[in-house]
């Protein structure tokens, strides 16, 4: 039997998503497999991550799947996209999004300017290996390695302050998933600092290299502040646009665009 699923395609600075309202999904769907099928760029719709959302009384719940069918704990760009979608569909400008137990406070300043307060970050979590272990690995591949630091912003990030070519970023990103370093994998951020801006590339756990990463931007900004490389406010520069970042009372606030690409119907065999 073939069923129909309504979807929305959006992107944040090139980091693209297929977004589906949970009410349009049958309880019989294998969501992990559905995510893999819809994310496939040749036989599906194509995206970096598959997003399911559900409206509750005073918040929206967001569930995130990677293209390999695994779940993700946070996605800053998807949060901005979902906030814009809710604004377009309801007119709401102040929107609370919950991802697991993480509360994200969103404000739609205008259609192309969405702010997300992602809360505080942590530099001390059980999953984080010692700096010496990470440094010993990273210095094998890096030229002009300045610093490495782990950040937890609801999902795990390793920030490497160094320059690395894209083909090498892929190699390093994959090798850093080694279980002896990161038992559950890690998002790897390659950051260069210049004139209080961070030029950022991210290898995302479960997705690979993407054109932008909102949570990576937040983690890299927080790391840059902690290390004294930048001050607040600052700008994170990606290939297809920038995010404005600031710190207020220990909270990280991300601001940037979200783009509606298409609305459509996906036909699924059950």
UniProtKB/Swiss-Prot annotation:
Its main location: cytoplasm. Coiled coil: none annotated. One of its GO terms (cellular component) is cytosol. The record marks 157, 204 as: Could be important to modulate the pK values of the two catalytic cysteine residues. GO terms for molecular function: diaminopimelate epimerase activity. It holds the Pfam family DAP_epimerase. Keywords: Amino-acid biosynthesis, Cytoplasm, Isomerase, Lysine biosynthesis. Pathway: Amino-acid biosynthesis; L-lysine biosynthesis via DAP pathway; DL-2,6-diaminopimelate from LL-2,6-diaminopimelate: step 1/1. Substrate binds at residues 15, 49, 66, 76-77, 155, 187, 204-205, 214-215. InterPro entries: DAP_epimerase_AS, DAP_epimerase_DapF. It catalyses: (2S,6S)-2,6-diaminopimelate = meso-2,6-diaminopimelate. Its EC number is 5.1.1.7. The keyword Isomerase applies. Homodimer. Belongs to the diaminopimelate epimerase family. PANTHER family: DIAMINOPIMELATE EPIMERASE, DIAMINOPIMELATE EPIMERASE, CHLOROPLASTIC. This is Diaminopimelate epimerase. It comes from Rickettsia massiliae (strain Mtu5).
């Amino acid at each position: 039997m073939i069923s129909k699923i309504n979807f929305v395609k959006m992107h944040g600075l090139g980091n693209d998503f297929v977004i589906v309202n949970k009410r349009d999904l049958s309880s019989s769907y294998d969501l992990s497999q559905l995510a893999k099928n819809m994310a496939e760029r040749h036989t599906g719709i194509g995206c970096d991550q598959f997003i399911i959302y559900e409206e509750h009384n005073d918040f929206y719940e967001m569930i995130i799947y990677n293209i390999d069918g695994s779940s993700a704990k946070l996605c800053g760009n998807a949060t901005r996209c979902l906030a814009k979608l809710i604004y377009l569909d309801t007119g709401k400008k102040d929107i609370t999004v919950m991802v697991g137990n993480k509360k994200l406070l969103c404000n739609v300043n205008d259609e192309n300017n969405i702010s997300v307060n992602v809360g505080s970050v942590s530099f001390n979590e059980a999953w984080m290996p010692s700096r010496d272990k990470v440094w010993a690995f990273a210095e094998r591949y890096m030229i002009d390695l300045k610093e490495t630091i782990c950040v937890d912003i609801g999902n795990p990030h390793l920030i490497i302050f160094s320059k690395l070519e894209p083909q090498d970023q892929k190699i390093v990103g994959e090798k850093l998933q080694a279980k002896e370093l990161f038992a559950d994998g890690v998002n790897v951020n390659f950051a260069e600092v210049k004139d209080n801006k961070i030029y950022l590339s991210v290898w995302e756990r479960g997705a690979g290299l993407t054109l932008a990463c909102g949570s990576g931007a937040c983690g890299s900004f927080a790391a840059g502040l902690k290390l004294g490389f930048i001050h607040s406010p600052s700008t994170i520069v990606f290939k297809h646009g920038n995010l404005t970042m600031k710190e207020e009372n220990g909270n990280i606030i991300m601001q940037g665009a979200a783009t509606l690409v298409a609305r459509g119907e996906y036909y699924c065999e059950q």
